[in-house]
């Protein structure tokens, strides 16, 4: 491990020099590539330097303890320092092992989130709106931007489907664990008998795909335009601004009508299409990995029931990691970081186990 860390530190120092060279700065594509490499290495190199500094401190303290001429009080202080530094080194070693794990190449990307109402009729649609609000508030809390891509509302405050984009550094790394089936148990406001209804919605978190990730051949795309309409078929506008794009080889269809401009609707539809096609490739890769892994966290299986939101008990339970939180209101208001951290930690622990086995 230490050899690998020393190599990465050397590479980091080499990149630090390169990105300051005028000829590299003048070549902007190359400069941006090297700056990203440098930035990606920064956290692990800083942690490694902290480790080396701590190890040096430990060696110095041990040297004092070996010195028989040293003052007794000084030696006692050295003993205490050794215990503290040994504990710190153990923690740093664990952190460095995690930082050395292979990184998901999509972790830094923006995401497209798709929420669809499943079983449960109107209640499922209302819950889809609840989760849209939850992710929106979480994004705002961490300083990310949210952009609506497409929405099909139920007319009573819910969504049959809502697609939106979250832009922010590391959005995919934190939100990718949200993909799957979310179940809600609550008493509908229209339920006079007080019976608890169970509804489900599905969430898909897709990393945004650019041309480098997935080259879209426009010869494979059919674009249809139509007049956008609102609830009850009422005409929203009198121009054919709504767009439907079809990827002919796979039959994947995306429609967008939220914008007044046909061009903007087409751009959004193609962005969603590209992300869905990249996601198919990611799902295939993960299916292969899942055959070798017993992981419950990182598989991204869309048909898997991942979480239950129980309103009468005020609890949220994540079934993959058996974590239950009793603060449903704040959770639905975007306070979901604790659950995200628990999922990330579990996923990292499983990957470490695989590396060490």
Curated annotation (Swiss-Prot):
GO terms for molecular function: translation release factor activity, codon specific. Methylated by PrmC. Methylation increases the termination efficiency of RF1. Keywords: Cytoplasm, Methylation, Protein biosynthesis. It holds the Pfam family PCRF. It comes from the Bacteria. It is found in: Cytoplasm. GO terms for cellular component: cytoplasm. The modification N5-methylglutamine is found at residue 234. SMART domains: PCRF (SM00937). PANTHER family: LD18447P. NCBIfam families: prfA, PRK00591.1. Peptide chain release factor 1 directs the termination of translation in response to the peptide chain termination codons UAG and UAA. Belongs to the prokaryotic/mitochondrial release factor family. This is Peptide chain release factor 1. It comes from Alkaliphilus oremlandii (strain OhILAs).
